[in-house]
């Protein structure tokens, strides 16, 4: 599933390509035919994101809400648009660009009230300037749930996925099994500042890199026999010599590195199924504290 930085990057791309002009809207697949007919030829006023949710604002307060889910893609290409192939749920067209949406979990026309109802369910988004991290801190510190689950809860922090969850916890030496109520405010504040920086970097690069520059050569040496990543969130985007060396690994400390040595302590990185997703951590660097009952 695309993480929040990818959806923000997509929103910026669509905004720069289509905002401020009438667009052709169609649904070659047919599942969005009624919505497309309502919007066809109207002005797309802007595109923005909150967490993993994409919003396309059209005139007369109409909003298309898109959630890509696990398999959705929304790809922009230069015009002219070819004949649609495959299950294209939504196509946007302008004289210069077209964009095809395939396989989303959600694609619906909403009003402003509908958008507000979705945002009510979401926590603060680290990539939004109006984000209030204190809302996330209060939810975390008021919970007995483990941090490995809380960071994936979109009502706590919007936009984090499996990669950022694993890497953020490792970078701050927090066990994924630590209860939220055990977290110190200073650690939560440091984690928030860190994830803001990591996600902004992800928007800029077009890929997730969480390994500090001074540790990249050591990690690449540990993973020299490992195939390049096939995860679109980890590969692609900015291509530099330093990042090409990381193609042998993933540019991450623990994510998808189970069974391999931790670059910081040498212990074997572990993984297990946790709440429906794969969880990665270093048992030595991320020891769980005891919590009084």
Q: How should these model regions be labeled?
A:
Residues 1-112, 185, 270, 289-293:
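Gly/Gly-Pro- and Ser/Thr-rich, intrinsically disordered tail segments characteristic of DNA damage-repair
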Residues 13, 17, 122-125, 222-225:
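Low-complexity, intrinsically disordered/propeptide-like segments
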Residues 22-35, 53, 139-293:
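Basic, nucleic-acid-binding surfaces and adjacent catalytic neighborhoods in DNA/RNA-processing proteins
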Residues 64-174, 179-186, 191:
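Phosphate/anion-contacting hairpin/loop surfaces
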């Amino acid at each position: 599933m695309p993480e929040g930085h990818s959806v923000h990057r997509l929103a910026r791309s669509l905004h720069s390509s289509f905002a401020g002009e009438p667009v052709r809207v169609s649904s070659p697949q047919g599942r969005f035919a009624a919505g497309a007919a309502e919007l066809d030829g109207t002005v797309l006023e802007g595109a923005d994101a909150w967490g993993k949710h994409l919003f396309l604002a059209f005139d007369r307060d109409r909003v298309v809400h898109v959630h890509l889910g696990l398999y959705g893609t929304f790809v922009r290409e230069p015009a002219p648009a070819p004949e649609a192939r495959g299950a294209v749920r939504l196509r946007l067209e302008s004289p210069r660009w077209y964009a095809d949406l395939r396989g989303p979990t959600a694609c619906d026309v909403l009003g402003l009230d509908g958008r507000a109802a979705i945002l009510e369910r979401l926590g603060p988004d680290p990539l939004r300037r109006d984000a209030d991290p204190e809302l996330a801190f209060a939810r975390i510190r008021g919970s007995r749930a483990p941090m490995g689950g809380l960071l994936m809860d979109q009502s706590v922090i919007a936009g984090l996925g499996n990669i950022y969850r694993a890497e953020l916890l490792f970078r701050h030496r927090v066990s994924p099994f630590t209860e939220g109520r055990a977290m110190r405010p200073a650690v939560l504040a440091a984690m928030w500042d860190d994830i803001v920086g990591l996600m902004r970097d992800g928007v800029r690069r077009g890929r997730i890199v969480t390994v500090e520059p001074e540790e990249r050569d050591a990690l690449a040496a540990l993973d020299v026999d490992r195939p390049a990543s096939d995860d679109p969130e980890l590969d692609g985007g900015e291509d530099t010599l330093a990042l090409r060396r990381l193609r042998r690994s993933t540019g991450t400390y623990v994510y998808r590195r189970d069974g391999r040595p931790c670059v910081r302590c040498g212990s074997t990185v572990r993984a297990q199924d946790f709440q429906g997703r794969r969880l990665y951590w270093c048992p030595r660097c991320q020891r769980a504290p005891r919590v009084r009952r």
